[in-house]
C-alpha cells in the first residue's frame, strides 16, 4: 500500500551550553530530505529565532531523525523539502505546559 513518510524517531537537540547559561530560548525551522531508507539529509535552516544561536544543534539533531519512508507504487521514494520546527525552551515549572518561546508559535 502507498503511504506518506512518518516520523519514527526524533532525537531531541542538545541545548547549546552558552544559550542555556544565558537563559536564551528560541526555535529553528529546518528543511531537509527524507531518503528512501528513512534517514534525513541536507538539512537547511529556513529561519531561526534568534538567528544563529541554535542552527547547528538543530541540524545535528535532525540528521539523526528516522522516518518510515514514503511509498509510491510499492517503492520507497525520496521526499525533498520536508519541514520541521525544533523548539529550544528551558524547563521551568512556572511556565504553562503549552508555552512556546516568543516568535516560535
Predicted regions and their residues:
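Short proline/glycine- and basic residue-enriched helix-capping loop/turn segments at helix->loop/beta transitions
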Residues: 1-33, 57-104
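A short, conserved beta-strand element enriched in hydrophobic/aromatic residues
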Residues: 31, 41-50
Amino acid at each position: 500500500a502507498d503511504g506518506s513518510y512518518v516520523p519514527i524517531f526524533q532525537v531531541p537537540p542538545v541545548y547549546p551550553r552558552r544559550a542555556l547559561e544565558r537563559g536564551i530560548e528560541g526555535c529553528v525551522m529546518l528543511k531537509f530530505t527524507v531518503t528512501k531508507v528513512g534517514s534525513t539529509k541536507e538539512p537547511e535552516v529556513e529561519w531561526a529565532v534568534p538567528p544563529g544561536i541554535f542552527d547547528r544543534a538543530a541540524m545535528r539533531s535532525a540528521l539523526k531523525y528516522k522516518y518510515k519512508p514514503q511509498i509510491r507504487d510499492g517503492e520507497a521514494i525520496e521526499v525533498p523539502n520536508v519541514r520541521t520546527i525544533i523548539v529550544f525552551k528551558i524547563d521551568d515549572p512556572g511556565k504553562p505546559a503549552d508555552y512556546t518561546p516568543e516568535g516560535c508559535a
